[in-house]
Design a protein with these regions (language model features):
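Conserved catalytic core of sirtuin-type NAD+-dependent deacylases
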Residues: 1-236
Length: 236
């Protein structure tokens, strides 16, 4: 069965996406460390993006975060727009994403569960005041609130747990879906990778450039770029 046939037959599609969905919008996967990286930073990205590092070295955290995690010029790609179109047509019931860029909402998707939070939301750790991304992007050093507290991104760092409400919403959507499209993720990040076990539906589709541990479970496996594949779907 082709992806088009699966989409045509499905009424409750849930899309689960990882970094590979956003790379086509020019957002690099921070795990793909290049040679230049080691000239700029003394620590691996996983260490810099940990809660203990944030607490102990906020200046170094923000130097990395502003340079590598904020991509102000990124725009939604074909995958984001197609998913918004599928939602509008009543076919896609939810997008569950490991990405923190807000591009699904920018493309028009409304029901989006951001497992790892969003760079667009930030808050003061002292008084709780909410800030947009500009407060972080435009700060010269450590972004601070008017009260003097440090502003922290609403992004799930290593050593932090996922937001329980977001997890419950995602699990509920996956459990009710008749089709799950898993895309742009190597399934290496837990607990997010464990979400697929809640899927009880009929069609499990996997789109990823490289093979994943879940390939053998899928009804259809496409080793291609996500935007390339989704852009070909006719919504009808």
């Amino acid at each position: 069965m082709t992806l088009q046939e699966i989409v045509d037959r499905s009424r409750r599609i849930v899309f689960f996406g990882g970094a590979g969905v956003s790379t086509e919008s020019g957002i690099p996967d921070f795990r793909s460390v290049d040679g230049l990286y080691h000239q700029q930073y003394d620590y691996p990205p996983e260490q810099i993006l940990s809660r203990s590092f944030f607490d102990e070295n906020p200046a170094e955290f923000y130097r990395f975060y502003r340079s590598k995690m904020l991509c102000p010029n990124a725009r939604p790609n074909a995958a984001h727009y197609k998913l918004a179109e599928l939602e509008q047509a009543g076919k896609c019931t939810a997008v569950v994403t490991q990405n923190i860029d807000g591009l699904h909402q920018a493309a028009g998707s409304r029901t989006v569960y951001e497992l790892h939070g969003s760079v667009l939301r930030n808050h003061c750790m002292r008084c709780g005041r909410a800030y947009g991304v500009e407060a972080v992007a435009e700060a010269a050093d450590i972004p601070r609130c008017a009260c003097g507290g440090i502003i922290k991104p609403d992004v799930v760092l290593y050593e932090e747990g996922l937001d329980q409400q977001t997890v419950e919403g995602a699990v509920h959507a996956i459990a009710r879906a008749d089709c799950m499209i898993l895309a742009g993720t190597s399934l290496s990040v837990y607990p997010a990778a464990g979400f697929i076990r809640y899927f009880q539906g009929e069609h499990f589709v996997l789109i990823n450039r490289d093979p994943t541990p879940a390939d053998k479970l899928a009804d259809l496996v496409l080793h291609q770029k996500v935007g390339q594949v989704l852009s070909q779907i006719q919504v009808r």
